[in-house]
């Protein structure tokens, strides 16, 4: 026999009615829909929130909100929550706002009330100065609600823009994210995707097939691997949803709650005595200037516990970006990677590094730059695709940054790429060079071919010509291809033993912790987008 319905005209009845409604809101998606979600290896909206937030900290907002649409019979199905779970809680004890799209209700599609819930929690985060994590798993705009859905998308975009650089915004893509829905993650600071589960695209495979005749699958078009390796839309490719959420929590641990506060710190005074581990850096640079080495080694030797949280690891691997700590304080790392394209800068690397430097600057995180760059990658593709304009973004990012900037030149720093990579001339506070540094307009081979073209051309015997060329190369290297010409002019503040790098960075950051620098008043700069 079913239980008698509670009398809602009594206090006990009203309380029982509330409990019933809460239960209904918590399980708004059908059991079958939840089962299908789990069968795909995906979690539900609430399970994701539970994994992200500290246990028992989640406070839900608008759980009883329901859509008001009457088109196409949708009025007969008005589940609580309307397909998105919103609220706030804590991650490692720090306040965070969150919204999680529920694919088990209307396929996670965005309608008016759904959008209003997201807008409300974003406004709440902005007023209270706490990060926003958006968990995306939805089918785009709710067709039944027409232009109203599009209007709410734009309301969300506007808030993404207003919150940019004020509170950290992280997008977690754990399912489909198509059409207009992709632009919100695109504006946020970091986007995390799950391999084989996440898909992002403006137009899907069917539309592309109809319009262009191209055959392309979901994974190839907009999968996690595509956006992590080719487009640069995403910052991390996770193996599963738990890995993705752990990465998000890792990011939050390095970021402040807002632009007016400092990043979380776990102060621990560094031992400034040079250790055997530090001395490993003295043997890092090969004798041959053309032999690569792994810049990760230099980075990890400088950071606490050798811990480096890399961002966009699979995109533009010729430059490394990510977070670490020095004496328990957050730092951002930008570094050329000689293992890829010899560390050359290209369009993708320039834009990747520029965006990262600007993110660090927005959130009060010092930037440490490791330089080993032979120049910009040559080629017609680079020129035609706009390396001049797009490479200039990196200049803009360093020159406008007011956070502490420390640069370490480990080997090559040639031509315009020397200027671009956090040089003293762009406003870096502390510029260090290893004895292996080669700071010059170009490498010895190219310089000799230009400077001594006539001299070499006058030597008819090929063997004698090669011998003379080697002599001239040696002369150029001895004269200019070193850190001391730059040191004489104050372009580098010190030439140091590689093993002393961490000590110099620790002392530099201690001094720069109270740095204050103001740029000329302006509405905003005009970065070459």
Task: Indicate residue ranges for each PLM-predicted region.
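Ligand-binding clefts of soluble mixed alpha/beta catalytic domains
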Residues: 1-529
